[in-house]
A protein has these predicted regions:
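A structured binding-face within diverse protein domains that lines the active/interaction site
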Residues: 1-127
Length: 127
């Protein structure tokens, strides 16, 4: 099943299960970080980790939107995220977001995991 590109073409091919995203358009979600939570629990809570993009104050999360709702795209984890989770959200630096919207870059490059060193990780809880 594929997701229709912003220009009406079938640009994005995703294995998206039973949901139908035909007619969806691409979107960008601005963020300055995201969290992952890991076991074992400490005082009944999982350990909280903050991921930020190295050398950037913010980044884009790639998404799709349909009928007023959006979904963030995920991919296999890159080396920075793999120790904490079995997948990661798809990220782009601030200057690359336009390529997601205008389909000017190869889909496989856009949906690739972040390379080693692209993200910084900091434990938030417990301190």
């Amino acid at each position: 099943m594929g997701v229709e590109g912003a220009d009406g073409t079938a640009g994005l091919q995703l294995p998206i299960g039973r949901a139908t995203f035909a007619g969806s358009t691409r979107c960008l979600i601005p963020a300055d970080g995201f969290y992952e939570f890991t076991e074992p629990k400490v005082q009944g809570k999982k350990t909280k980790w903050l991921f930020t993009m190295a050398g950037q104050p913010w980044f884009w999360i790639l998404g799709i939107v349909k009928d007023g709702a959006f979904a963030m795209l995920t991919t296999e984890p890159g080396p920075d995220v793999a120790p904490y989770h079995d997948r990661q959200i798809v990220l782009l630096p601030p200057d690359a977001g336009v390529h997601w919207l205008d389909l000017s870059a190869a889909q496989d490059l856009m949906l690739a995991p972040s390379p080693a060193g692209a993200l910084t990780v900091r434990r938030i809880w417990p301190e």
